[in-house]
Amino acid sequence: MKLKIGISPCPNDTFIFHALLKNLIDMGTFEFETTFADVQSLNEGAQAGDFDIVKISYGNLWNVQDRYGLLYSGGAMGYGCGPLLLSTKSNSLDPDIPVGVPGKNTTANALLRFWATGESVTYETEYAVFDKLYHDLLNADRIQSLVIHENRFTYEQDGLHLICDLGEYWEKKTEAPIPLGGIVIRR
């Protein structure tokens, strides 16, 4: 039986699926067709039912829970690892300049909405692939943006300004770990 798997190229996903994808464990009659994509594309693929097993944003789980069940392993939750809202200009959000967001159904976008609602902040969004957003800031093609992953450790060196650590904001308001993403399987 061939199963369609969708994961991102991030180290978490490739580590979790490494043994399976490299045939290091006996999977019997199961074969895998793997798609590597950014998380928004994976979220959309899950909504369309394109995959048998797929990594999604927890912010998208409610959109697919009728077709997919959440696996008990492989999820990403934690402290101190949420998305950052950064700017090339200042430490405050300019409501007249769109915020670059790595996808409509991403946890990063859900955390941005959570912060904006809690702080009564208004903003406009522009969606782009997550790995393009940071480069756009560095190249001055974008003024303010959400960034995820490793860039949280380098933004100050790169001359960018922190508007809000959305993960830290979530942790303070909820006293819960940041729900980033999980792996779901077709029901």
What function would you assign to each model-found segment?
Residues N63-Q65, L112, T154-D158:
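Short loop/helix-cap segments at secondary-structure boundaries that form the rim of catalytic
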Residues E126-R187:
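Pocket-lining segment of extracytoplasmic ligand-binding domains
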Residues F30, Q65-Y68, L93-I97, A140-R142, ...:
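Short coil/turn connectors at secondary-structure junctions
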Residues K2-K22, C81-I143, I148-E150:
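Bilobed "Venus flytrap"/periplasmic-binding protein-like clamshell domains
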Residues M1-S73:
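N-terminal hydrophobic or amphipathic helices and topogenic motifs
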Residues M27-T29, Q65, G80, D94, ...:
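Short, well-ordered coil/turn elements that cap or connect secondary structure elements
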Residues E31-E33, G69, V121-E124, H161-L162:
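Conserved beta-strand segments of alpha/beta enzyme cores
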Residues L70-S92, E171-R187:
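Hydrophobic/proline-rich hinge and linker segments of small-molecule sensing/allosteric domains
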